[in-house]
Amino acid sequence: MPGRSTSYRVYHTAIAALCALGLASALAAGPTLAEDTKLLKTPVSPVPPLFDSAAIDKATAALDGIVETAMKRTGLPGLAVGVVYKDKVIYAEGFGVREIGKPGKIDPDTVFLLASVSKPIASTIVAKLVGEGVVDWHGTAKSYNPAFALSDPYVTENATIADLMSHRSGLRTGSGDLLEDLGFDRDYILSHIDQQPLDPFRVTYHYSNIGYTAGAIAAATEAGKSWEDLADEVLFKPAGMASASYRHADYISHKDRAHIHARLADGTWAARFDRNADAEAPAGGANASLNDMLRFMRLQLGGGTLDGKEIVKADALAPPHEPQMIPGPPRSPAARAGFYGFGWNVSYDDEGRARIGHSGAFELGTATNVTFMPGEDLGIVVLTNGMPIGVAEAVGAAFLDVAQNGKQTVDWVGFLGGLFDQMRAAEAPEIDYADVPASPKPAQDLAAYTGAYGNSYHGPLTVSADDRKLSMSMGQQGAPVAFALSHFDGDTFSFETIGENANGLAGAIFTVGSNGKAEKVVLDYYDRTGLGTFVRE
């Protein structure tokens, strides 16, 4: 995601890394001057593999126990995990049930929602178009999709597919997500993100589902196809990913599908929700089986070739696997930077070995992880049907831990579960609307608040009173979402947030004019970027 003049810095960083890598290899494998005054002409390269076949066999043999222990500790309903090594599937197993309380077992053909593991699939699809000359990573989204627009004219004209798919457009994390929760479709969301504020272009990293989607849709528009049909045509069918799709309806139609589960406050699990991510399909709307994803993993490790057939040109598939943006600088001199490619997280060990992966998470009930190490010709896929609690990542981390160290050296389930708990705690609302004042100021007569309000981003809002109770409705025309309003204090009411991004109770703060009627209402939950004010019409 370089947008500044970075070629000088990147050049010297690359040279420094190569020198360090070569020095480490030479010290490990080459003669010393004391032993032999004949110097090597070049450093030892490439870096030797981290694992051998025996190490992989040991880690694979440990997987059953790793998974069973993780599921027992957490109560996770179901999981599927597979390993690819040297272009062969050496492990593919399902554990647990498709839906809690029902007998259907998970197997390698069970279809899961992938959440953000959809992103590396999407970048592979765009890479196919790049390889065919249909689009270029550095072609502008506007040139491919004239409807594309952001709030800054310069960014609108200059943002490339690369900018959008590496999260460096300036769109803030969560932009457009709450529209999706309200039921708005992709066209509506993409046509309204030009109201979202932007942070500095190509300078800031903000993980943005709708920004990523905009980049992928620009490519599909240039190809003259819907995203869903394009995925089928250029990837899923050629790669033999028989169950894979970017249509939520296809997921629902599968009898052998993993229902999604949320963990309740008492620690039990329940299949309460559905999660239709069609609006952001390239970023989060794919569904596939473990067997599909193992073919996808082989394609990545094979540089675009699968079963001897070139599906994506290697030079077009390489950029997604390479650093394109730095999500955050190292926090200490001893730490290392993590990078983002196009739909992939990219990191390197001390000797320069790449580790590439991505996680997916729906709070409503799914968590996934894919990780591969191209230098080791090794990849692992973990799919779960429970909300993100760190298990998907922990299984992959424990597998690699055993491969490298002969045993687990970290309590990965505990460690990663704790991180997820911390992230949720950090998202707690600033105001606890459940803590109603002991002596709240009285509300106006409810008629003061009722009526129609307008908002150019979220659309119309209707406030109604019935049987001494206030409610509001908003969302997609013809299918609005209703919210009950409970009095909190004075002209402030509370309502329960909904959908993937739900965060407990939020506030509806009315401003009442001199005529005794509310002039506007601010919904603080929808006002994160200043777009939550609804004005009386």
Predicted regions and their residues:
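Bacterial N-terminal signal peptides
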Residues: 14-28
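Bacterial N-terminal signal peptides that target proteins for export
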Residues: 2-18
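Peripheral terminal and inter-domain segments
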Residues: 2, 394-537
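Short, conserved catalytic-motif segment at the N-terminal edge
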Residues: 51-114, 134-136, 143-144, 150-151, ...
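Short, surface-exposed loop or secondary-structure junction motifs
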Residues: 95-100, 153-370
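Short, well-ordered beta-strand elements
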Residues: 368-371, 376-385, 520-523
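Boundary at the C-terminal end of the N-terminal hydrophobic targeting segment
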Residues: 28-34
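Short, small/polar residue-rich loop motifs at catalytic or cofactor-binding pockets
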Residues: 75-78, 364-367, 457
